[in-house]
Amino acid sequence: MFHQAKWDEPTIFELSRPGRIGYTLPKPIEDVDVDIPEKLRRKSPLNLPELSEPEVVKHYTRLSEMNYGVDSGIYPLGSCTMKYNPKINEEIASHPGVAYVHPYQDEGTVQGALKIMWELEQWLKEITGMDRFTLQPAAGANGEFTGVSIIRAYHIDRGETQRTEMLVPDSAHGTNPASAAMAGFKVIEIPSNENGTVDLEALENAVSERTAGLMLTNPNTLGIFEDEILEIAKIVHKAGGLLYYDGANLNAVLGKIRPGDMGFDVVHLNLHKTFSTPHGGGGPGSGPVGVKDFLKDYLPVPLVSYDAENDRYYLDYNVPRSIGKVKELYGNFAVIVRALTYLKIMGREGLKEVSEVAVLNANYLTQKLKGTRGYELPGKELRKHETVFSAEPMKKETGVKALDVAKRLLDFCMHAPTIYFPLIVHEALMIEPTETVSKEELDAYVEALKRISEEAYSNPEVVTSAPHNTAVRRVDDVLAAKKPVITWRMYRELKERGEIDY
């Protein structure tokens, strides 16, 4: 049984002692006189913790011992594709030619960096069937906002200002309706049918002259392939709308089918999911957006282009109807480097195998867990890259909820799946094992879920009071949402005002 390391570790600010030094800045070669305007000068010294190098190393080592990541074990967060990140990605990204390049350098001095971005675009175009890409968006939701903003600009440019509605399935990622709303659209929800796919009759009834587009993930968040996608595309296009592809689940179809061939006009991808770049605790990510040829003039500036005659890469600002910039500079470059490294190592056939094994793993787990007391499998049985079970029967019969199952899994040294999503499945357990998990790990995960089922029906308190072996057991989710304390400064100020007592 797993027992997490537990250190009563202070923050690095609490460990700070005046005068301790871990690093000394190099002296300038010559005196530098920089005239910084008074209004931009700090009024007080920068509050940096003062520690020796050994103290810093020990502090972060102790914290790492309490952490769990993709290098620790199975991490099957549904719809997140928490696959192993090959270490060669880090080796290439830390190369001085990558690490020390500066975005304000002259184009002539960064030809290698521009070539990397251009080459990645060629890979993504081939994988998705799109005609042009921007690498600027910083993450998936940023990519979504970029994509729907392009759709909005396209309709306005055509004088179709009445197209104010964005259709979104009820199984969609929560960021889809949020991104559409931020771009100024009214969100229209499309229900799923009994198979877990888009209800075509409901879609037919929803489209109109007000339809700007439909945002769709394929496979969807149940792990089910939208097998009527060509008919869906036909319905949306006939109404004058555009089809948007949320690339969160692209890992299921790499090298097998392309969004562009399914009828999609706009695509966003997640390099930090499909292409093995780190999720990094919320960033940095990368959410490139690809479009069909008729939309390329709306992409953010600059694009990276290649002048074959002079064998030169350059930043192309000649994008007549561009929606403008969606992130400063050119995107998260080090993430782009990691993704291209992965693609070059895997190759065309390797990417096909990625999808094959990801789908195999998800279906193997589904069949092993299916029929276990308390877990119900909604929708079609055949899944793609992920599977969703409902713990609703267990909750009704024992009082043990999906949250309790997730917490109990931590005691087995296994990361919990995504829970309570998609919203159309009550007490959802959303499991995406990815292709980098072994059969033995899958077997162990299923056995843990089966054991939790046995505990729920024989001694439910063991599950409802879990986890028992972690450094932190259950946090106050309501307090965390109502009064988040996310910085040391916030903590000190709230503590001084007596608003928190911990």
Curated annotation (Swiss-Prot):
Q: Which metal ions or organic cofactors does this protein require, according to UniProt? A: pyridoxal 5'-phosphate
N6-(pyridoxal phosphate)lysine found at: 273
**What cellular component GO annotations does this protein have?**
cytosol; glycine cleavage complex
The keyword Oxidoreductase appears for this protein: yes
Q: Which UniProt keywords apply?
A: Oxidoreductase, Pyridoxal phosphate
User: Known catalysed reaction(s)?
Assistant: N(6)-[(R)-lipoyl]-L-lysyl-[glycine-cleavage complex H protein] + glycine + H(+) = N(6)-[(R)-S(8)-aminomethyldihydrolipoyl]-L-lysyl-[glycine-cleavage complex H protein] + CO2
Provide a GO biological process annotation: glycine decarboxylation via glycine cleavage system
Q: Which Pfam families match?
A: GcvP2_C (PF21478), GDC-P (PF02347)
EC no. given is 1.4.4.2
**Gene Ontology MF terms:** glycine binding; glycine dehydrogenase (decarboxylating) activity; pyridoxal phosphate binding
Under the heading PANTHER family, the entry gives: GLYCINE DEHYDROGENASE (DECARBOXYLATING), MITOCHONDRIAL, GLYCINE DEHYDROGENASE, DECARBOXYLATING
The record's annotation in HAMAP family points to:
GcvPB (MF_00713)
Read off the NCBIfam families from this record.
Answer: PRK04366.1
Question: To which protein family does this belong?
Answer: Belongs to the GcvP family. C-terminal subunit subfamily.
Q: Subunit structure of this entry? A: The glycine cleavage system is composed of four proteins: P, T, L and H. In this organism, the P 'protein' is a heterodimer of two subunits.
Relate the protein's function as given in its record.
The glycine cleavage system catalyzes the degradation of glycine. The P protein binds the alpha-amino group of glycine through its pyridoxal phosphate cofactor; CO(2) is released and the remaining methylamine moiety is then transferred to the lipoamide cofactor of the H protein.
Instruction: Write the protein's name.
Output: Probable glycine dehydrogenase (decarboxylating) subunit 2
Source species:
Thermococcus kodakarensis (strain ATCC BAA-918 / JCM 12380 / KOD1)
Instruction: List the lineage, top down.
Output: Archaea, Methanobacteriati, Methanobacteriota, Thermococci, Thermococcales
